[in-house]
Amino acid sequence: MLSKYIKELTEYGKRTGLLPECEQTYAVNLLLDCFQEDSYEDPGEVEERPLEDILKDLLDEAVKRELLTDSVAYRDLFDTKLMNCLTPRPAQVQETFRRKYDENPEEATDWFYQFSQNTDYIRRYRIKKDQKWKIDSPYGELDITINLSKPEKDPKAIAAARKSASVTYPKCQLCFENEGYAGRGDHPARETHRIIPITINDSKWGFQYSPYVYYNEHCIVFNSQHTPMKIERATFVKLFDFVKQFPHYMLGSNADLPIVGGSILTHDHFQGGRYTFAMEKAPVEKTVTISGFEDVQTGIVKWPLSVIRLSAADADRIIELADHILKTWRGYTDEEAFIFAETDGEPHNTITPIARKRGDLYELDLVLRNNITTKEHPLGVYHPHAELHHIKKENIGLIEVMGLAVLPARLKEEMELLKKYILENKEITTNEKIEKHASWVAEFLPSYPQVNAENIDRILEEEVGKVFVKVLEDAGVYKCTEKGRQDFLRFLNTL
């Protein structure tokens, strides 16, 4: 059967353009070596099957031959090794991308996105498992996702990694050294990972897609050096350098401080893609004029977080104003609004910036952030408050800021259980997995005159969405109230 599965895989490679006809024998021999097998019998014609099914059979065969431990982490390491037998080398990929880019940047990214799926670097069959829905809110239509495509940490792999000497190569999952890396129990295989080198702000950066695709064409742009995240004038220059090269993509950066930043603060990187987030659709509700920057349209966006939108035909003018706003905000304290630039020498104010091209104008959204903590809010005053942690307690990073909730995988099972308990009128507090949701359910359930098997799913989706709106409102340094707007304008007046 091994010969049949190998033939199916190489036929898939030819069908998707990964493998030229003249390399089929070469790929077959590489695959045989992965299985420590010496001979191959051509099975003749084979049926066309989904990649997931072919890989499953190959992995089962490898387990049978005791070539790998049967767990998700080790199966992922092994199937990436198999797919690399079909994947063109980096120079070929870069050359194809450049050739297409010279004709049309969109054509280049379309090709590379498809390529990243065909190599199984983006595992399409896992992405499909993600639960996604939209909800209406006072701020427009928001996206809610429960992320199921990122594999849970594998206990066997973690235990094995603990026993082995600590490895510090690659330094992190964003480093250039990941390209071609076989991976290990605690680090994903990246043999099929291909990086497109790009130049931004006169320095070498890389362009890739996120293997977990939280939204369409979710890309990552990262420094070739392992250097920490830092929001500064150069950040705005880099964002616009990228948008000028790929005007059909938006690009943003996580903030550079804990709590309000993303999960990786140690490696300078941005995230972007081809998706219109709710925040981009949100209108400017109040325009302001900044002295000396009359040529830059400036305004407060109707959004739960505190957003200043700048737009102009000249990106350099936006960069100058953004730098002025950033420097002012870094040092800004307003006790009445509970904004403190620093306490005990620890800085609190930073910005989450997002750049895009809209028609003939360049646009930059500056989201004001502050990571101060108090006894009442030990995880952050401008962070989801404790009563919302049953749904979301993780950092509110760039993707959430723009209106897309990335909720933890645990919610899938918890919502299924809640549904059952609500429909069967069972006491939620008796189940330790879902007792944390009890007071929330008690609060919203009375507002629905009828709850049945037909509408329970939508009710839970709506209510989870309402919690996400509150999460975003908690993260806003200036609330969407009359006082909040006055406080916001007081800051803008200092500019």
What are these regions (language model features)?
Residues 258-266, 344-350:
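Beta-rich nucleic-acid/ligand-interaction surfaces
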Residues 1-221, 225-228, 302-304, 318-322, ...:
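Active-site microenvironments that recognize anionic phosphate/pyrophosphate groups
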Residues 216, 248-250, 263-265, 278, ...:
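Coil-to-beta-strand transition motifs
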Residues 234, 243-263, 272-324, 330-333:
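Catalytic or ion-translocation cores adjacent to nucleophile or general acid/base/metal-coordination motifs
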Residues 191-194, 226-251:
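Helical scaffold of the NTase/Pol beta-like nucleotidyltransferase catalytic core
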